[in-house]
Curated annotation (Swiss-Prot):
This is Cytochrome c oxidase subunit 2. Residues 1-14, 88-230 are mitochondrial intermembrane. It catalyses: 4 Fe(II)-[cytochrome c] + O2 + 8 H(+)(in) = 4 Fe(III)-[cytochrome c] + 2 H2O + 4 H(+)(out). Cu cation A1 binds at H161, C196, C200, M207. Component of the cytochrome c oxidase, the last enzyme in the mitochondrial electron transport chain which drives oxidative phosphorylation. The respiratory chain contains 3 multisubunit complexes succinate dehydrogenase (complex II, CII), ubiquinol-cytochrome c oxidoreductase (cytochrome b-c1 complex, complex III, CIII) and cytochrome c oxidase (complex IV, CIV), that cooperate to transfer electrons derived from NADH and succinate to molecular oxygen, creating an electrochemical gradient over the inner membrane that drives transmembrane transport and the ATP synthase. Its cofactor is Cu cation. It holds the Pfam family COX2_TM. One of its GO terms (molecular function) is copper ion binding. Its EC number is 7.1.1.9. The keyword Acetylation does not apply. Its main location: mitochondrion. It comes from Oncorhynchus mykiss (Rainbow trout).
Length: 230
């Protein structure tokens, strides 16, 4: 999760997020090389005493500054498109969860079960216990099994919201009257935090998201307990 004075991304907890981090490093290196080249040319043009007032055109330079940007754009676009298709692909999900945004909390419904659903509210600061995080804890976590494809159907009951968990590399808009979907695979057990990422009113910053990834046997025990309590 995020920590004070953090400069980089959160640790990846899904294959898609790992791909996004690799693409970020790839694009950053290209931007760094371009910036270095442009800075060198600017310094060279300003500092040199050599000038030629009679050059009207240069076929070689025009070819270079046309072909080189095209190659750079291709080097950025191809891996970007690959990740885009990976994020959009949902093959044989083992579990489907419907996340519904409200002002200002989330509700979850496990559609593969007959009666498994709950509301998830932020834990007030005065009710926190040692080890919990202010503005990030919820009274009910969305529990999922690790190493399993999870599909999340996202919508909203009132206004625009956005369901986002950075460590899992997922962010999907919740639009009233529209059912969007996203998917992820939690590659390791853990607790992953997110927040509503679309301004939705006065308490927009007080509707956190908590995803807890557990081994399959623990998930089965949790789901059985939730069904018994329903």
């Amino acid at each position: 999760m995020a920590h004070p004075s953090q400069l980089g991304f959160q640790d990846a907890a899904s294959p898609v997020m790992e791909e996004l981090l690799h693409f970020h490093d790839h694009a950053l290196m290209i931007v760094l090389l371009i910036s270095t080249l442009v800075l060198y040319i600017i310094v060279a043009m300003v500092s040199t005493k050599l000038t030629n007032m009679y050059i009207l055109d240069s076929q070689e330079i025009e070819i270079v500054w046309t072909v080189l940007p095209a190659v750079i754009l291709i080097l950025i676009a191809l891996p970007s498109l690959r990740i885009l298709y990976l994020m959009d692909e949902i093959n044989d999900p083992h579990l489907t969860i419907k996340a519904m945004g409200h002002q200002w909390y989330w509700s979850y419904e496990y559609t593969d079960y007959e009666d498994l659903g709950f509301d998830s509210y932020m834990v007030p600061t005065q009710d926190l216990v040692p080890g919990q995080f202010r503005l990030l804890e919820t009274d009910h976590r969305m529990v999922v099994p690790v190493e399993s494809p999870i599909r999340v159907l996202v919508s909203a009951e009132d206004v625009l919201h956005s369901w986002a968990v950075p460590s899992l590399g997922v962010k999907m808009d919740a639009v009233p009257g529209r059912l969007n979907q996203t998917a992820f695979i939690a590659s390791r057990p853990g607790v992953f935090y997110g927040q509503c990422s679309e301004i939705c009113g006065a308490n927009h910053s007080f509707m956190p998201i908590v995803v807890e990834a557990v081994p399959l046997e623990h998930f089965e025990k949790w789901s059985t307990m939730m069904l018994e309590d329903a």
